[in-house]
């Protein structure tokens, strides 16, 4: 549940005041999933100010998801398992399994704002700006790991952005990467404590 949606001046939206925007109008301009994502990000069970300009931030996140998908799709698909793991691989695996645990806990407590914050932190900083930069010269080697993470991220997004998540899942289905006919029929990832390495996570903080 969320509180009252206010305008950018934190006043109650009202047609008579001319400061109201209907969900239908926002959806027509930006799409259903964009509105769902922004409301999940902003709503903490309290009143909040709605600024449509923040939709540009949502668009940037969706564009990053699209760019990562394009990067992963051009990688080879023949190897389903990695033969060896470098330090950066073990680091992203640890961060990913930490993310699974925290996102699961947040969903179970209906803390959707926290789900979005955790997702963005991992997507932007851990995956895009750090890990992918580390592995660009050996990206073919880590294709199975990247594809596993991508499937997990789509599962995380699916309850909030069902249409966009399904679009990317169907691309995976077309490429023969997944068996489930829909992301909404897939198994939610489970965190494995044996794949966590907190010391490695801390050591990477000093590097990045």
Located regions from the model:
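Conserved beta-strand -> loop -> alpha-helix junction used to position metal-binding or nucleic-acid-contacting
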Residues: 2-5, 186-187
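Acidic, turn-prone loop/beta-hairpin segments
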Residues: 78-104, 132-208
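Catalytic adenosine-cofactor/nucleotide-binding cores of aminoacyl-tRNA synthetases and other
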Residues: 4-85, 174-179
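Conserved short loop/turn motifs at secondary-structure junctions
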Residues: 2, 52-57, 119-121, 137-142, ...
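Extended, hydrophobic alpha-helical segments in both membrane/secreted and soluble proteins
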Residues: 1-2, 9-12, 23, 34-35, ...
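Short helix-adjacent coil turns
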Residues: 107-114
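Generic structural signal for hydrophobic core residues of well-folded globular domains
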Residues: 30, 38-42, 68-75, 119, ...
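Core structural elements
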Residues: 60-73, 87-99, 116-137
């Amino acid at each position: 549940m969320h509180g009252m949606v206010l305008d950018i001046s934190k006043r109650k939206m009202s047609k008579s005041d001319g400061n109201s925007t209907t969900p239908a109008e926002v959806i027509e301009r930006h799409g259903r999933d964009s509105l769902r994502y922004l409301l999940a990000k902003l709503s903490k069970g309290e009143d909040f100010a709605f600024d449509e300009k923040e939709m540009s931030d949502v668009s940037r996140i969706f564009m990053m998801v699209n760019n990562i998908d394009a990067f992963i799709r051009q990688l080879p698909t023949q190897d389903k398992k990695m033969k060896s793991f470098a330090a950066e691989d073990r680091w992203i695996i640890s961060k990913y399994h930490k993310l699974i645990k925290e996102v699961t806990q947040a969903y179970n407590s209906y803390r959707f704002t926290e789900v979005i914050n955790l997702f963005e932190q991992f997507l932007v900083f851990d995956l895009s700006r750090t890990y992918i930069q580390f592995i660009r010269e050996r990206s073919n080697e880590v294709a199975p790991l990247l594809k596993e993470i991508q499937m997990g991220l789509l599962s995380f997004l699916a309850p909030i952005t069902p249409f966009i998540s399904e679009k990317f899942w169907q691309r995976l289905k077309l490429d023969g990467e997944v068996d489930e006919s829909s992301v909404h029929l897939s198994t939610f990832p489970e965190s494995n404590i044996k794949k966590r390495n907190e010391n490695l996570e801390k050591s990477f903080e000093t590097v990045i």
